[in-house]
Amino acid sequence: MKGLVIKNTGSWYQLKTDRGELIKAKLKGNFRLKGIQSTNPISIGDYVLIEKDLYGTAFISTIEDRKNYIIRRASNLSKQSHIIATNLDQAFLIVTVNYPITTTIFIDRFLVTTEAYRIPTLLFFNKTDLYNNHDMNYADILIHLYKSIGYSCYKIAATKDEDLLFMEKLLRGKITLFYGHSGVGKSTIVNRLIPNAKQKVQSISKHHNKGMHTTTFSKMLELPSSSGYIIDTPGIKGFGIFDIEKEEISHYFPDIFRFSPYCKFYNCTHQKEPACAVREAIKNHYISKSRYISYINILEDVDMNKYREAF
């Protein structure tokens, strides 16, 4: 029997079978013996084969080949990876410039990973109904920046019906990952798109202007009329890059990669090398300084954590 993994609550996985049934299954113990370094060898979005024992307990015996996946480091000091989701058609990064603040470093870390794994990513600047003039101007600056690089960006408010209808059109017929900090409004959007989802919603901390975790486990939710799936994920503070070599990082900054062939040295890291076309482009405002700061931030992070074997 074949199944699609739609939820993971620790040792149990909830699956939707090819017969349309919802069942719970465990992972067979021998998966732990295959040298897998990921904290979760089975992920939301995986297609798996299921076996049942004499007592009727379902076990996942095989993972089918993945079309793609998105991965992050499990924690700041970890040698392990955490697979966020697999077999995606696209990712929606939910961003807020206030209530709470999403940094450009967080945005760029996520975009580098989706570039590396060839997952089309759209940016949604949420809570625009709460923005003052300063917030709106800053959102417009970021939208101009990321649109110039090639990313689709949209200003939305989860309270507005027309914005939700627009998002719903983009979701049709696709498996979409929702990602972002706690408190940016992912669960509110999901609840409005899928009224029976009942994802928990909690206000942000007034003291720290940061979101508090409401979604505990990642979960795949079906849109009405079977028009697609959303994978809602727990909000996180940071995003650790995993499985990308130092020399590859600039490849996943399209704006930096555009100029790197013109550097004097083929292996230029765009830091202190002479005749660096990238640093010259920054001086001439062809590359945003915030993007370069993110690039250096990731470069230093990867330098300290040379862990590549994710599986």
UniProtKB/Swiss-Prot annotation:
Q: Where is the CP-type G domain?
A: 77-239
Binding residues for Zn(2+): C263, C268, H270, C276
This protein's UniProt keywords: Cytoplasm, GTP-binding, Hydrolase, Metal-binding, Nucleotide-binding, Ribosome biogenesis, RNA-binding, rRNA-binding, Zinc
Write out the annotated subcellular location: Cytoplasm
- Per the annotation, how and in what number is the cofactor bound? Binds 1 zinc ion per subunit.
In terms of InterPro entries, this protein maps to: G_CP_dom, NA-bd_OB-fold, P-loop_NTPase, Ribosome_biogen_GTPase_RsgA, RsgA_GTPase_dom, RsgA_N
Annotated binding of GTP, by residue: N126, K127, T128, D129, G180, H181, S182, G183, V184, G185, K186, S187, T188
CDD domains reported for this sequence: S1_YloQ_GTPase, YjeQ_EngC
Q: What is its EC number?
A: 3.6.1.-
Annotated Gene3D superfamilies:
Nucleic acid-binding proteins (2.40.50.140), P-loop containing nucleotide triphosphate hydrolases (3.40.50.300), Probable gtpase engc, domain 3 (1.10.40.50)
- What PROSITE patterns does the entry give? ENGC_GTPASE, G_CP
Keyword Metal-binding in annotation: yes
An example molecular function term from Gene Ontology annotations? rRNA binding
Give Gene Ontology CC terms: cytoplasm
Q: Known SUPFAM superfamilies for this protein?
A: Nucleic acid-binding proteins, P-loop containing nucleoside triphosphate hydrolases
* Pfam families with a match to the protein in the record: RsgA_GTPase, RsgA_N
Q: Which cofactor does it need?
A: Zn(2+)
Q: Which GO terms describe its biological process?
A: ribosomal small subunit biogenesis
Protein family:
Belongs to the TRAFAC class YlqF/YawG GTPase family. RsgA subfamily.
Subunit structure and binding partners: Monomer. Associates with 30S ribosomal subunit, binds 16S rRNA.
Write out the function statement from the record: One of several proteins that assist in the late maturation steps of the functional core of the 30S ribosomal subunit. Helps release RbfA from mature subunits. May play a role in the assembly of ribosomal proteins into the subunit. Circularly permuted GTPase that catalyzes slow GTP hydrolysis, GTPase activity is stimulated by the 30S ribosomal subunit.
NCBIfam families in UniProt: ribosome small subunit-dependent GTPase A
User: Which protein are we looking at?
Assistant: Small ribosomal subunit biogenesis GTPase RsgA
Q: What gene name does this entry carry?
A: rsgA
